[in-house]
């Protein structure tokens, strides 16, 4: 397939002396990926202007339609710390995931000498899955597939630091099983950096 994943992985395995992966005959065939995603977020916040310490809660509902992914989702994020950014939370790796654009001029990325902030966050997202190309297989060609779970949830814990216009965040994401017969649930880390100017 056009992504050249096999060639890239074989190159690294040859370079490092690792055994080559043997599942490439079962990968998805070339197919354009199209996904339209809509998400609505609502924020409630409480911040002490003297200490800059505060907390907020951000709820969300959403919908994705496409051959790569079709699902409904809902969830929330809670943040607590100093100089919370005036944005809509920290997203892990996903389509349309970056939402850290400041929403006002008092965001710590803009405020004079106090251009720093530090906060912890916890979030969850639950999805009702209609289609997942990585589990259901290609849309128009016969390919391998597995029986997917209809409901999948993510929970995340993380920390974010803001200095000047930069924001560095780390999250550890815990995901429930995505298909029947899956040995265990997944956990992965997400490190992101953004800069506002």
Language-model segments: residues:
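Outer-membrane beta-barrel translocator/pore domains, especially the C-terminal barrels
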Residues: 8-12, 41, 47-49, 131-132
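Transmembrane beta-strand segments that form the barrel wall of outer-membrane beta-barrel proteins
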Residues: 23, 55-65, 144, 170-176
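Secondary-structure boundary elements
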Residues: 39-55, 68, 82-86, 161-166
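Outer membrane beta-barrel transmembrane domains
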Residues: 83-197
């Amino acid at each position: 397939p056009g992504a050249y994943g096999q060639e890239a992985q074989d190159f690294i395995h040859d370079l490092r002396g690792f055994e080559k992966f043997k599942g490439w005959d079962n990968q998805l065939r070339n197919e354009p990926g199209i996904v339209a995603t809509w998400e609505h977020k609502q924020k409630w916040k409480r911040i002490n202007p003297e200490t800059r310490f505060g907390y907020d809660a951000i709820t969300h509902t959403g919908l994705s339609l496409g051959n790569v992914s079709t699902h409904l989702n809902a969830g929330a994020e809670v943040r607590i710390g100093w100089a919370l950014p005036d944005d809509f939370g920290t997203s892990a790796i996903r389509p349309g995931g970056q939402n850290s654009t400041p929403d006002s001029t008092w965001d710590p990325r803009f405020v004079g000498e106090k251009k720093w902030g530090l906060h912890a966050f916890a979030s969850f997202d639950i999805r009702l899955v209609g289609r997942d190309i990585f589990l259901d297989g290609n849309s128009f060609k016969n390919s391998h597939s597995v029986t997917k779970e209809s409901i999948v949830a993510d929970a995340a814990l993380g920390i974010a630091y803001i200095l000047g216009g930069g924001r560095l965040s780390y999250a550890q994401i815990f995901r429930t099983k995505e298909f029947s017969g899956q040995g265990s649930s997944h956990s992965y880390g997400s490190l992101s950096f953004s800069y506002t100017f």
